[in-house]
Amino acid sequence: MAKKGMVEREKKRQRLVAKYAHKRQALLEQISQASSQQERMDLHRQLQRLPRNSAPTRLRNRCWVTGRSRGYYRDFGLSRHVLREMAHEGLLPGVTKSSW
């Protein structure tokens, strides 16, 4: 299980990304449509002034049960360990053991 601080830090990043998403998108569109190099540099500086953790690339997928970041399955939002346990217990609808 991941440390609580890591999970909370990730939640904080998600809140910041959501908060600044519209402003960041608007600045990126303005940068792409800027006519002069000076205008583009000014807009880029404004983009750099936004909080670092508000960039979506800083997010890391984490299991919603354990907080584990590795072995993450997007379809379920779970790590491989929890996915296996829940599948064996029949808690995931549509997931069955393979047989061939």
Swiss-Prot record:
Similarity remark: Belongs to the universal ribosomal protein uS14 family.
Keyword check for Ribosomal protein: yes
Molecular function per GO: rRNA binding; structural constituent of ribosome
Gene: rpsN
Cellular compartments per GO CC: cytoplasm; small ribosomal subunit
The UniProt record lists the keyword RNA-binding: yes
Domain of life: Bacteria
Assembly behavior: Part of the 30S ribosomal subunit. Contacts proteins S3 and S10.
GO biological process terms held by the UniProt record: translation
PANTHER family: 30S RIBOSOMAL PROTEIN S14, SMALL RIBOSOMAL SUBUNIT PROTEIN US14M
Taxonomy of the source species: Bacteria, Bacillati, Cyanobacteriota, Cyanophyceae, Acaryochloridales
Protein name: Small ribosomal subunit protein uS14
Signal peptide: none
Membrane-spanning ranges: none
UniProt keyword list: Ribonucleoprotein, Ribosomal protein, RNA-binding, rRNA-binding
Xref: SUPFAM superfamilies: Glucocorticoid receptor-like (DNA-binding domain)
Protein task: Binds 16S rRNA, required for the assembly of 30S particles and may also be responsible for determining the conformation of the 16S rRNA at the A site.
InterPro entries from the UniProt entry: Ribosomal_uS14, Ribosomal_uS14_bac/plastid, Ribosomal_uS14_CS
PROSITE patterns, per database record: RIBOSOMAL_S14
